[in-house]
Curated annotation (Swiss-Prot):
Residues 51-97 form the Gla domain. The gene is Mgp. Keywords: Chondrogenesis, Developmental protein, Differentiation, Disulfide bond, Gamma-carboxyglutamic acid, Osteogenesis, Phosphoprotein, Secreted, Signal. It comes from the Eukaryota. One of its GO terms (biological process) is ossification. It is found in: Secreted. Disulfide bonds join 73-79. The modification Phosphoserine is found at residues 22, 25, 28. Requires vitamin K-dependent gamma-carboxylation for its function. This is Matrix Gla protein. Associates with the organic matrix of bone and cartilage. Thought to act as an inhibitor of bone formation. InterPro entries: GLA-like_dom_SF (IPR035972), GLA_domain (IPR000294), MGP (IPR027118), Osteocalcin/MGP (IPR002384).
């Protein structure tokens, strides 16, 4: 009986400390966490946006041949189906490479 009382007090303290809710874990105190459309991209400077666009243009221009072939095949449904079975290289060769002696 003597050990039961301290054990109950210890359990109550453990529950109280574990269930304590600090103010740090509460949601933001801001009135509205969302911003309007005009201010949505103000965190990124115009120079950074320009640099990102330029980098994307360079990346689009310097694509490897296999990626260009794959994109061409993705736009044509029959080629895409053939590619699922035999691979994109075989599908591109079948549908887009000109055969010898063929007149187009």
């Amino acid at each position: 009986m003597k050990s039961l009382l301290p054990l109950a007090i210890l359990a109550a303290l453990a529950v109280a400390t574990l269930c304590y809710e600090s103010h740090e874990s509460m949601e933001s105190y801001e009135i509205s966490p969302f911003i309007n459309r005009r201010n949505a991209n103000t965190f990124m400077s115009p120079q950074q946006r320009w640099r990102a666009k330029a980098q994307k243009r360079v990346q689009e221009r310097n694509k490897p041949a296999y990626e260009i072939n794959r994109e061409a095949c993705d736009d044509y449904k029959l080629c895409e189906r053939y590619a699922m079975v035999y691979g994109y290289n075989a599908a591109y060769n079948r549908y887009f490479r000109q055969r010898r002696g063929a007149k187009y």
